[in-house]
């Protein structure tokens, strides 16, 4: 029987199957952070249980850490309690922790790939919705709830249904200033934020094939914004090159054995997908969200859509509501929208390639005096690499604040947030109401577009600038 990549990974991890279609899957890697794990550990104590596989469990502090100080007190009492609990839990249950003093501390979905913890063919879970990021390596990865975190800690397994298969083939020629962020935002806008509900999405096509691993991670990171359980990209030579000599990657003879296995991780010819999309990105422009959902997105030269253009009454009502919240009027050009803050960071766009692309725009330039801008490297490793290349100096000289690693302004869970009615150009993954702070207004963009917004104080078309 011909199988998709998803089916191969799923089937190879089945420990037990039930007649109702549910299976118990073995989990290869369990990633933890300070927010969704405390209750799970406490429940283990109450039940007098241990962690089944401490060596397959890794933890970091990221969601509510301060990006201005390594002081555990800096983000408030609740954040302090959560971080203290993580320290206590990891020590008691013998789990490796990337705490505030660890040189490689950072965002969970950044540090795991760069350390070689994330490998093709794995089943990976984390109490965070953007665990789909790891699918870029051909790993079946998805977010789980706190009760499921407890179950994986105790058993190293998880009950899961079998999802349907979707293929999104991305074809065409990538234009000037078009990044992986623009590609995935365009796809979300094209097919909608619920198109992937009930599916695992496999991304393929010549555009995906040419992407670096960091670009692929951006694409898979936002598969969840299509409503999918996760996203996948088959591993190839680009994957192997990225993983070679990483700290936790296989070494020596094990490396060759691993590659032999990884080469089998591809969808078989004539395998059946339940739904297929072919999307040509040849003529797309840099993308900017205008509403309160990632699928409310348009090209930089476009206007906020007129409500009458929506034939679907639900989408029409959502557009009206979004415009009211975002304080935008239909017919307004994106390039006429001014902003207050710029955020470059998050598990979507805080890797070294993201920082390099933004720094090229900012070099020898100064940001608008009306804009406050911060750049937050995704990990200690990214931060050191950027500093060794002098990128920190470029950002600082342009007027950005150069911060410590963390989730930062992606979510209003730490000190980095929007004030009431502030408008932000953000490289994060969600623009929901209040996501970056109470009544804050979020526009999702690529690092290039964020850098341009900082320079001009408004959204700008890079194709029309010198």
Curated annotation (Swiss-Prot):
Pathway: Amino-acid biosynthesis; L-leucine biosynthesis; L-leucine from 3-methyl-2-oxobutanoate: step 2/4. It catalyses: (2R,3S)-3-isopropylmalate = (2S)-2-isopropylmalate. PROSITE patterns: ACONITASE_1, ACONITASE_2. The keyword rRNA processing does not apply. Binds 1 [4Fe-4S] cluster per subunit. One of its GO terms (molecular function) is 3-isopropylmalate dehydratase activity. GO terms for biological process: L-leucine biosynthetic process. Catalyzes the isomerization between 2-isopropylmalate and 3-isopropylmalate, via the formation of 2-isopropylmaleate. HAMAP family: LeuC_type1 (MF_01026). Belongs to the aconitase/IPM isomerase family. LeuC type 1 subfamily. This is 3-isopropylmalate dehydratase large subunit.
């Amino acid at each position: 029987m011909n199988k998709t990549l998803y089916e191969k990974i799923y089937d190879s991890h089945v420990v037990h199957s039930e007649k109702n279609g549910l299976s118990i899957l073995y989990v290869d890697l369990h990633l933890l952070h300070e927010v969704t794990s405390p209750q799970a550990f406490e429940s283990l104590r109450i039940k007098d249980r241990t962690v089944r596989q401490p060596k397959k469990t890794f933890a970091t502090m990221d969601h509510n850490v301060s990006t201005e100080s390594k002081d555990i007190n800096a983000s408030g009492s609740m954040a302090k309690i959560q971080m203290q609990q993580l320290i206590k839990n990891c020590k008691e249950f013998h789990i490796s922790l990337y705490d505030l003093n660890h040189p490689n501390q950072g965002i969970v979905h950044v540090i795991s790939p760069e350390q070689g913890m994330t490998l093709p063919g794995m089943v990976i879970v984390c109490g965070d919705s953007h665990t789909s990021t790891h699918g870029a390596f051909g790993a079946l990865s998805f977010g789980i709830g706190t009760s499921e975190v407890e179950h994986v800690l105790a058993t190293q397994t998880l009950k899961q249904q079998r999802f349907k298969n979707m293929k999104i083939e991305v074809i065409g020629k990538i234009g000037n200033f078009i990044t992986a962020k623009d590609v995935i935002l365009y796809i979300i806008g094209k097919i909608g934020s619920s198109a992937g509900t009930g599916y695992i999405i496999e991304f393929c096509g010549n555009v995906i094939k040419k992407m670096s691993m960091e670009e692929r991670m951006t694409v898979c990171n936002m598969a969840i914004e299509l409503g999918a359980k996760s996203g996948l990209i088959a591993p190839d030579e680009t994957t192997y090159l990225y993983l070679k000599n990483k700290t936790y990657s296989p070494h020596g003879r094990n490396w060759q054995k691993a590659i032999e296995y990884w080469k089998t991780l591809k969808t078989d010819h004539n395998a059946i997908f339940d739904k297929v999309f072919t999307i040509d990105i040849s003529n797309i422009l840099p993308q900017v969200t205008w509403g309160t959902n990632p699928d409310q997105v348009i090209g930089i030269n476009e206007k906020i859509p007129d409500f009458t253009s929506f034939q679907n009454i639900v989408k029409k009502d959502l557009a009206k509501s979004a415009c009211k919240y975002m304080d935008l009027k239909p017919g307004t050009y994106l390039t006429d929208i001014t902003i207050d803050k710029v955020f470059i960071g998050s598990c979507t766009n805080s890797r070294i390639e993201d920082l390099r692309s933004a720094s090229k725009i900012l070099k020898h330039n100064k940001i608008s005096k009306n804009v406050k801008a911060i750049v937050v490297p995704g990990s200690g490793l990214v931060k050191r690499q950027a500093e060794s290349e002098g990128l920190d100096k470029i950002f600082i000289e342009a007027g950005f604040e150069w911060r410590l690693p963390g989730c930062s302004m992606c979510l209003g869970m730490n000190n980095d947030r929007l004030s009431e009615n502030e408008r932000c150009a953000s490289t994060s993954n969600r623009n929901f109401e209040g996501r970056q702070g109470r009544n804050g207004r979020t526009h999702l963009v690529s690092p290039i577009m964020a850098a341009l917004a900082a320079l001009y104080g408004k959204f700008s078309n890079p194709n029309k600038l010198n």
